[in-house]
Amino acid sequence: MTSVVVVGTQWGDEGKGKITDFLSADAEVIARYQGGDNAGHTIVIDGKKFKLHLIPSGIFFPEKISVIGNGVVVNPKSLVKELAYLHEEGITTDNLRISDRAHVILPYHIKLDQLQEDAKGDNKIGTTIKGIGPAYMDKAARVGIRIADLLDKEIFAERLRINLAEKNRLFEKMYDSEALDFDSIFEEYYAYGQEIKKYVTDTSVILNDALDAGKRVLFEGAQGVMLDIDQGTYPFVTSSNPVAGGVTIGSGVGPSKINKVVGVCKAYTSRVGDGPFPTELFDEVGDRIREVGHEYGTTTGRPRRVGWFDSVVMRHSRRVSGITNLSLNSIDVLSGLDTVKICVAYDLDGERIDYYPASLEQLKRCKPIYEELPGWSEDITGVRSLDDLPENARNYVRRVSELVGVRISTFSVGPGREQTNILESVWANI
């Protein structure tokens, strides 16, 4: 029994897709356990970029099984489009498996997402308008439509009719918006269901059988710990649990079968959407990091907010997700800066604190306390070992590890697979 979970430790966009793709080389099964097509990940193979939103990164290994678990909310339209994109690029998807228990995102979820966000005005959350939140709402309210329902023509029609009638009353009466048409949704989405039918199965059985057989299973999280609905900057969060504990619920695998948790982070911090961000930069340094790091959302295309590395956030993520290993990405983006900073604690009303407050009002008053380190000017994109890094960059990496309290297993100096450097194998000693 060998399993590793990959989680984002910040607000998403840490490079999880790249690290998952890298670790997938030694895995036999790769599974997603939460989120939907609101999460974007970019994988670079032989210099070519592939952007995925729903399908696991392991799809690029045809001999390995890629799983979309029951905790994922699936937009069939997006899934079919993504499958077509991969097929056009010559990538086989015969190794994909989709949970029959996963819930389905339908057009009324997306419409409701937009209407709710618009109604919030200045208090908007910054949702990607992908229908993720409303789909999880239906799931919790026990009125959601699952993949198993989508494949059954009569059941899908019955449940869609009931749900759409309720949603249309909401659109017309509360939001003064037009109703959606049952026939067009039913025909379009039932057809999508038939297209993906061959991939659908009980993925919990596949995952548990693989683990019981001693195979290596890699679980891929979406978003990041600070977007977790319980442990993140609520309400500026996603509607699921990206923390490692979400694996057990979203994949149907018990907690006793999880061995290691790899926390992925960047050498700085970024965030898309609204919400607290104590180390955010508004100066030319922030602009430089954004441009050099190409900090624009994979899903939204929106410029990401950027800031210095925040060890308070990282220690929070380590604690609530049980992180055992750290993967530090994008060190190269900081090259050329005379000074680099790390937030070591916060000043809250004159008091030094080293924890991340739950209160948004307190977070607004938190001022980062920085430790300054000398920067480096060298181009490090070709570095292939820790010893090859300039001394100042090497000291920065070590200081990050010390402050977070987790050993670094890999570090990256660029987007390519070959730019990921291994300090220790996360698959070893399991």
From Swiss-Prot:
Pfam families: Adenylsucc_synt (PF00709). IMP binds at residues 13-16, 38-41, 128, 142, 223, 238, 302. Substrate binds at residues 298-304. GTP binds at residues 12-18, 40-42, 304, 330-332, 412-414. Signal peptide: none annotated. The active site is at 13 (proton acceptor), 41 (proton donor). One of its GO terms (biological process) is IMP metabolic process. Belongs to the adenylosuccinate synthetase family. Homodimer. NCBIfam families: PRK01117.1, purA. This is Adenylosuccinate synthetase. It comes from Streptococcus uberis (strain ATCC BAA-854 / 0140J).
